[in-house]
Amino acid sequence: MSSMYHDYDHLTASGKGLWSKFYGLVDAAVLLYDEIQRRGKIVSEEESQKRIFCLFPRRKRSSLVKRQQKLNGGFISFTSSSLIDLNQLPTDSEIEDPQTSDSQMKTLQNSSSEPCTSLVLFDYKTAESEKMEAKTLQNPSSELCSSLVLSDYKMAESEKMETKDPPNPLSLCLTGNTSRKRRAVEERKRTGGFKKAKVAPFPGTARDTPKWLVKVMRDMKEAKDAKLIFEKTLFVTDINPTQNRLSMPFNNLLQNDFLTSVESRIIKEDINNNKKIGVGAILVDQRSVKWGVMLKRWELKKESGKGSWNYNLICGWNDVVEANGLKEGDNISVWSFRCRGVLCFAMEQSSSSLALCLC
């Protein structure tokens, strides 16, 4: 104790004696205070437990309840008089008043011969499974309690039946609040008199990637995302050297999502501006020859004020036409893909024009 005070060694003998006694008194006071607090806490906890379990009896374990039931020779029946009315429970102020609490406790004791047992069994019933509820139904003694238990049992049985035998969605649809047109369609489906129309697959996704393009992409390394974007029969303007461009009308594109957001912004800013060159790209033909081209957007306005716009491959298209022997009436397909982020196109010719070119 003396080690807690740094100046204890510097005191005189009489001073040390006085301080030692003072320390002893302080320690005794602290111990006494702790003991009083501990006893007060124990008393308050016991009083609160007595008060709680007086109003709401402690729930017994299921094994004890079953043992009591066997000793009594059967299930203890639920009666309306055996259940305590929660509205008659005393309030805090009434419990503090000894006169009112004694009279009301007698009333609670007289309301049931076994209040604790009935409350335990009531809680036990709600916590047990549906099998225990079915057993309890075998010996109901009160109309009120038996009707409540019977309604719960019927609800449980109905849920089981719904799980085992789910309702027919067709019958629900026919009997529900639907329009006459929907009911007629469902009736046709059920009787087999209604058939769905066959829809032709989208041409952009129906065709597989050509084998020659697969080989080209494999040789280029890191090439991916091949998609068919355009098919066309060449016109005179497409092979005219003075035009030097392949026109791809936007409305005729099979897919229009082959550009990145940056490329779309560049092309939009370069509309009908000859000083801007557009977006650079690579075009590959069926001979695996690569050509440098530019993609631009041209807007065509009509006298009515309405207009349309096209994608055009320029700056190198004449070389592609000459090398592949393209002429008016030839059918071509244009594919797009990416190689390390660079926009690439692949041109596939019809078999007849390709044979002439190879000769």
Swiss-Prot record:
Coiled coil: none annotated. Residues 250-351 bind DNA. GO terms for cellular component: nucleus. It comes from the Eukaryota. Pfam families: At2g31720-like. Gene3D superfamilies: DNA-binding pseudobarrel domain. It is found in: Nucleus. Residues 92-111, 159-192 are annotated as: Disordered. GO terms for molecular function: DNA binding. Its main location: nucleus. Keywords: DNA-binding, Nucleus, Transcription, Transcription regulation. Residues 100-111 have a biased composition (Polar residues). PANTHER family: B3 DOMAIN PLANT PROTEIN-RELATED, TF-B3 DOMAIN-CONTAINING PROTEIN. This is Putative B3 domain-containing protein At3g24850.
